[in-house]
Amino acid sequence: MKKIAVLTSGGDSPGMNAAVRAVTRTAIYNNIEVYGVYQGYQGLLDDDIHKLELGSVGDTIQRGGTFLFSARCPQFKEEDVRKKAIENLRKRGIEGLVVIGGDGSYRGAQRISEECKEIQTIGIPGTIDNDINGTDFTIGFDTALNTIIESVDKIRDTASSHARTFIVEVMGRDCGDLALWAGLSVGAETIVLPEVNTDIKDVAEKIEQGIKRGKKHSIVMVAEGCMSGQECADELTKYINIDTRVSVLGHIQRGGSPSGADRVLASRLGGYAVELLKQGETAKGVGIRNNQLTSTPFDEIFAESNRKFNSQMYELAKELSI
């Protein structure tokens, strides 16, 4: 292994820069040349590929976002398009590709490994949604979680002052981990997740019971994948006469300097990705399980049967929100 490339793809997440830094410096330490692909898979097509040096990743570990930039590239699903991308790697003698991103990014890496056996691919989970199988945590999840907690703590102050019910919408299309972990952390009265069928009438009854006990305000945490915050508010007011406000946290969840946990996770996974390439591994995603570094074949990561949901934590959150 003499040359590798690294790219960031899909939605950005805090800690991506730390992962790129770890990949770059681990590779250089092992006498491997590193190339940064700018603008994700689009950069592979456009040949926007540049050599990275030690200084290229200096002063990046604390920065949010990704200095390599990221872009959606739906045309990468087409075989002819992928051939062009593969040729851009081949002509530089690049033998390994590290892809930092989510599920869609992994699928692109798998295609490359299937269609060009001489290019090894390794995926690093970079998404705030924490929706990648094969790892307990994804890069960016902890930072986004802390952003939500800080925001909702402030929202609760004003909810308390005005005796209102706030519906807080957070990111999470298919995975409700942000809503679940944040909901437990801020003491949300109700958490609405895509993994659980929630009857809004039951939510209204729970809020009403709280009012009878003297509770003046409530927080309802909603993952965007099951319904919007406004839809939840509209449904609630069909069953109970309360003053509601909706707060959509939006892209603030993706930004900011990565937390210490995300910096450490990104550094460990980035270094491990290079070690796997050196060992000849390919078509795998790296992860952390029980604080141990692991790797999982892409096919297993994509399997719906392996999708994770912490039902015990959900039940605990319900018990503590009484």
UniProtKB/Swiss-Prot annotation:
Pathway: Carbohydrate degradation; glycolysis; D-glyceraldehyde 3-phosphate and glycerone phosphate from D-glucose: step 3/4. Allosterically activated by ADP and other diphosphonucleosides, and allosterically inhibited by phosphoenolpyruvate. It comes from the Bacteria. Keywords: Allosteric enzyme, ATP-binding, Cytoplasm, Glycolysis, Kinase, Magnesium, Metal-binding, Nucleotide-binding, Transferase. Substrate binds at T127, I128, D129, R164, M171, G172, R173, E224, R245, H251, I252, Q253, R254. It is found in: Cytoplasm. GO terms for cellular component: 6-phosphofructokinase complex. It catalyses: beta-D-fructose 6-phosphate + ATP = beta-D-fructose 1,6-bisphosphate + ADP + H(+). Homotetramer. Belongs to the phosphofructokinase type A (PFKA) family. ATP-dependent PFK group I subfamily. Prokaryotic clade 'B1' sub-subfamily. This is ATP-dependent 6-phosphofructokinase. It comes from Staphylococcus epidermidis (strain ATCC 35984 / DSM 28319 / BCRC 17069 / CCUG 31568 / BM 3577 / RP62A). The gene is pfkA.
